[in-house]
Amino acid sequence: MKILIPTAKEMNTDLPSIEAIPLKPESQTVLDALALYSASQLESFYKVSAEKAAEEFQNIQALKRQTAQHYPALKLFDGLMYRNIKRDKLTEAEQDYLENHVFITSALYGVVPALSPMAPHRLDFLMKLKVAGKTLKSHWKAVYDEALKKEEVIFSLLSSEFETVFSKEIRAKMVTFKFMEDRGGQLKIHSTISKKARGAFLTALIENQVQTVGEARRLNFAGFVYREDLSQPQGLVFVKEV
């Protein structure tokens, strides 16, 4: 069983660094394509300020020169979902579960264990980077599929842009999750609710050592409970009353 989570734009490098591991050939090809951009080209590529583009340029060049600092990916990424994941003070069983079941889908690194070393970078599948004449999605599709082809159960906490990197055969095995708030009988869904809830849900999976869809349905976390009336066999809906 694998649980898939996306990367995040926000990063925290105020952490102890860890040893890097060599980039896979597929990752090196992506890095080589990114490294062709100047700082000013990155400004329009990323749609960011000149200052932010200069910072990203330095990050890319440090990776290229193999001088970049690396951190455990789960702790490096620091978006809203990540800040709601239990990342410290894990029991031995929780640490084992995290290492064996939780994987991050990255447009630079591929599908990797959540605590893999990563360097600060910015890249996602909505970005129009050409890699050896291919889109990022087509560049990664075979590698992404290979990472999951033996899995019977795949929990996806990904957004659709990441899910569509996988083939239909792999996507057919994915169990997806929606998190909603019930405000006086009105069901609301928005990105802030979803991101926080995804982090809290992953924490509940880790703490309860969940291995099956049935076990996931029984979870009660951060005020969210499973709603069978709103769910499908492979699309689980959790609702919080506010």
From Swiss-Prot:
Q: Which sequence ranges are marked TM in the entry? A: none
PANTHER family, per database record: PEROXIDE STRESS RESISTANCE PROTEIN YAAA, PEROXIDE STRESS RESPONSE PROTEIN YAAA
- The chain's disulfide connectivity reads none
The record's GO CC annotations read: cytosol
User: Which GO terms fall under biological process for this protein?
Assistant: response to hydroperoxide
InterPro entries xref list: YaaA (IPR005583)
Q: What is this protein called?
A: UPF0246 protein SPD_1378
Protein origin, superkingdom:
Bacteria
Q: Which family does it belong to?
A: Belongs to the UPF0246 family.
